[in-house]
UniProtKB/Swiss-Prot annotation:
It comes from Prochlorococcus marinus (strain MIT 9303). It is an enzyme of class 2 (transferase). The lineage of its organism: Bacteria, Bacillati, Cyanobacteriota, Cyanophyceae, Synechococcales. It catalyses: (2S,6S)-2,6-diaminopimelate + 2-oxoglutarate = (S)-2,3,4,5-tetrahydrodipicolinate + L-glutamate + H2O + H(+). This is LL-diaminopimelate aminotransferase. GO terms for molecular function: L,L-diaminopimelate aminotransferase activity; pyridoxal phosphate binding. Keywords: Aminotransferase, Pyridoxal phosphate, Transferase. Its cofactor is pyridoxal 5'-phosphate. The keyword Lipid metabolism does not apply. Pathway: Amino-acid biosynthesis; L-lysine biosynthesis via DAP pathway; LL-2,6-diaminopimelate from (S)-tetrahydrodipicolinate (aminotransferase route): step 1/1.
């Protein structure tokens, strides 16, 4: 009989969001008339920008002609999209990133997991706690951890707590690590990093030969012009960091799938024999072998994000969701609930009232307010006693959800 990858058996009972879906399904079957409002999983609700839709329609029509048909495209992405990304998202902000260092993909979730393919299994890994579950679970699946303890922490990982007491800013690891995941604006807490804070991380990484995997999926939601959007705005980051970006949240591409990863040329790791190896070469080889590229139609839609019309429309989308976040913050604060985040990110991170545990508060909101959120403990042991609400919903639903919560 074929053997399975037993590392999967080390995973906790269910990935956070499937467990939420299971509880919602059970509740809905018992209460079919309940009008649920979902402020849980970070899926967008507003339509794709018109500029993107029109570009995709043109691309579809092109695909219906002999001269305009496109089959397999470059695994790294079409040059015109990579050039638009490099210019707008990096070069215009003073970052020395060129188009060849951009790898277009179908999601930053995939990339942040797949990047492990090119990194050795003996690397010592650090994550914040709470943390986006994919970072941890993908390492468990790849056999890079031991078993989980009673609190859900896996042997072999270094956990860096972030909480209200430390301003949701992780401290530099006290033990040696080789690889660290950073996410700013942070999912789930909504915290942001200043230039000085990121410079401290970059300095640490360069001094200690650490690779930073930097998730900037929510950079478009930053409201303060003094805050960095990319780690490459920080001196020395090209030598120690890979960055993940996505069109999912700023342009509504959760259902159309387009993202990109930045791997600077000259960024190096060590081989088993101690020689230096460029990570760009390994990632390029990995993508060429395991990925067939994002469809031409979708990439044309993503390219339209960088048009004048597209920029105006995605800015409007971001403003809409950030207004929702402001409403959630205001109403929860008025209800006497301690809130964090929601100022530079579409997530509000709240302290559960009355010392309720995270899943207890989830069930409380589900059954008594018919509102769905995300329990903080699902993001890690340090998330216990916290809860995440997402600003990704209609204004009507956000207003109604807040009315229901305040009525509890």
């Amino acid at each position: 009989m074929v053997q399975v990858n037993s590392n999967y058996l080390k995973l906790k009972a269910g990935y956070l969001f499937p467990e939420i879906a299971r509880r919602i399904k059970s509740f809905s079957e018992a209460n079919p008339d309940a009008a649920l409002i979902r402020l849980g999983i970070g899926d967008v609700t507003e339509p794709l920008p018109l500029a993107c839709r029109n570009a995709m329609k043109v691309a579809i029509d092109e695909m219906g002609t002999n001269t305009g048909f496109h089959g397999y495209g470059p695994e790294q992405g079409y040059d015109w999209l990579r050039e638009a990304i490099a210019k707008h998202d990096f070069q215009n902000k003073g970052c020395q990133i060129n188009a060849e260092e951009i790898f277009v993909s179908d999601g930053s979730k995939c990339d942040s997991s797949n990047i492990l393919d090119i990194l050795g299994s003996s690397n010592r890994i650090a994550v914040t706690d709470p943390v986006y579950p994919v970072y941890v679970d993908s390492n468990v699946m790849a056999g890079r951890t031991g078993e989980a303890n009673q609190s859900g922490r896996y042997a072999g990982l270094s956990y860096l707590p972030i909480n209200a007491e430390n301003g949701f800013a992780a401290k530099i690891p006290s033990e040696p690590v080789d690889l660290i995941y950073l996410c700013f604006p942070n999912n789930p807490t909504g915290a942001v990093a200043t230039r000085a804070q990121l410079q401290e991380w970059v300095n640490y990484a360069r001094t200690n030969s650490v690779l930073i995997l930097f998730d900037a999926a929510y950079e478009a939601f930053i409201q303060n012009p003094d805050l960095p959007h990319s780690i490459y705005e920080i001196e020395g980051a090209r030598e120690c960091a890979i960055e993940f970006r996505s069109f999912s949240k700023n342009a509504g591409f959760t259902g159309t799938r387009c993202a990109f990863t930045v791997v600077p040329k000259g960024l190096k790791g060590k081989s088993d024999d101690g020689s230096d190896v460029e990570l760009w070469n390994l990632w390029n080889r990995r993508q060429s072998t395991k990925f067939n590229g994002v469809s031409y139609i979708i990439q044309r839609g993503a390219e339209a994000v960088y048009s004048a019309q597209g920029q105006g429309e995605i800015n409007a989308l971001v403003s809409f969701y950030m207004r929702n976040a402001a409403i959630i913050r205001r109403e929860l604060t008025a209800a006497g609930i301690e809130v964090h985040g929601g100022e530079h990110a579409p997530y509000v991170w709240l302290k559960t009232p009355d010392d309720m545990d995270s899943w207890g508060f989830f069930d409380h909101l589900l059954h008594n307010a018919n509102v769905v959120g995300t329990p903080g403990s699902g993001f890690g042991a340090a998330g216990e006693g916290y809860f995440r609400l997402s600003a990704f919903n209609s204004r009507v639903n956000v207003d109604e959800a807040m009315r229901r919560i305040r009525a509890l």
